[in-house]
Amino acid sequence: MTRLRGLAWDHRRCWGPLDASIGPYCAANPGLEIEWDRRSLYEFGEGALGPVLGAYDLVVFDHPFIGDIAEGGLMVPFDLSAEQRRGFERDSVGASWQSYARDGRQWALPIDAACQVASYRPDLLERYGPLPRSHDEVLELGRRALKDGKWLGLPLVPTDAMCLLLTLGEPREDGDEFIAREKIEQAVGQLRQLAALSHPDSPKWNPIRCYDHMIAHDDVVYVPFAFGYVNYAFKADRPYLRFADVPTPRSAGALLGGAGIGVSTQSQHKQAAIDYALFLCSPGYQRDDYVKSGGQPGSLAAWQDTEVNALSGGFFASTLATIEASYLRPTHPGFISFFRQCAPHAAAALAGELQAAELADRLNRIYRETRHGQPQWSVA
């Protein structure tokens, strides 16, 4: 009996389609057992990766870890045939496929695709007119909503504050300066304007908490930037959300998220794990049971599928333009260290507790230290 253990993050978007795959996949592969455990969203995005690779065959993780994974040889590269590689390249949602590649090897498969998008309560927004298409239109919506005792929403916990800065700051990665000072000052100014019109609990929110609040209360009309979660677009016996492209002509700035699935080099069943990962990421499974079980597929075929969009209230079609042009964070070793150290500073700046110029100095100094010096944190 071959037993595979996998590690997901603790949201139905991740574990739902993984749990649903166990029965049919094991039935088609006698002698195989599969078990999925879960960890928090924070641990998925910023927690230590090294220790979990000793306990699991498969891990679902965030793509900025790729540089450290490749440098340390922590995962088994997917040595695919030319035909398989072309298939994944054609089926990539935006830069999802590219985000798990480094040094000429593919270290994970894109099992889930996401980026920062806009969202709203259709029943609340209808009284205010069409969707805003620019920063100024979002501010006008926020002012009008505030007069009615309603708010914008904006996830502002440190992780999301940093992601917002990357979306609006136009990073350029030219060696010594990650984001130009004037771009940081402009982005901080815009985000402070949005924060002033956002729900008072926004500093406590990640996207999940924001969306949970939106479906449980009637006081948040619109969110201009947050990582999309298809689960909140399914109609049910509760208010539901609709999702849209971000309200900026420079939609290329929207930060790419999503998740990859990789195989630990410490796995005793590497080929079985690779085969299972290929099944989970196949277009056939992704546009069928994967999305029906609450997943957000990493397959372009699924995003463009008519039935998938009918099931999800048009979530994928309504945000495809943004994710196709989304910004791919660096994947060099040390980037997770940079991000983790900078996130609290970004949150402080958006809260008005740190000057934008000082934020620029800190971010670029930490970038130089982690990019060219000795990282202060590692995946191990």
List PLM regions with ranges.
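Conserved N-terminal structural module of periplasmic/extracytoplasmic solute-binding proteins
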Residues: M1-F65, I366-A380
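Short helices/loops that flank or line small-molecule/ion binding pockets
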Residues: F44-A55, L124-L125, R143-R144, P207-V220, ...
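Hinge/lid segment of periplasmic solute-binding proteins
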Residues: I66-V117
